[in-house]
């Protein structure tokens, strides 16, 4: 597939798991002789939640929770059919969300 690229977006709460998965994908793509751009770290999505500690009163007593979503972007340029087959067979951990665009 000359002139094409595969864009892979990875998302996870755990950045170590995310980096491990990105490394696996890059190794698989390079082993099939494809050009790889990345992993490019994208901005971390940070969400704060403020919750009252007490079920009824004491509004001044609150608890804060934070959710961070780490993201990485990998581009595979001019992928061969071997590359696509290898990417389909790769096993990634359950905590990693993978979004692939052709």
UniProtKB/Swiss-Prot annotation:
Q: What is this protein called?
A: Small ribosomal subunit protein uS10
Outline what the protein does: Involved in the binding of tRNA to the ribosomes.
Q: Name one GO molecular function term.
A: structural constituent of ribosome
Q: Which superkingdom does the taxonomy of this entry point to?
A: Bacteria
From the broadest rank down, the organism's phylogenetic lineage runs: Bacteria, Thermotogati, Thermotogota, Thermotogae, Thermotogales
List the GO terms this entry assigns under cellular component, sorted alphabetically: ribonucleoprotein complex; ribosome
PROSITE patterns the UniProt entry points to: RIBOSOMAL_S10
Q: What Pfam families does this protein map onto?
A: Ribosomal_S10 (PF00338)
For this protein, the parts annotated as crossing the membrane are: none
Alphabetical UniProt keywords: Ribonucleoprotein, Ribosomal protein
Q: Does the keyword Ribosomal protein apply?
A: yes
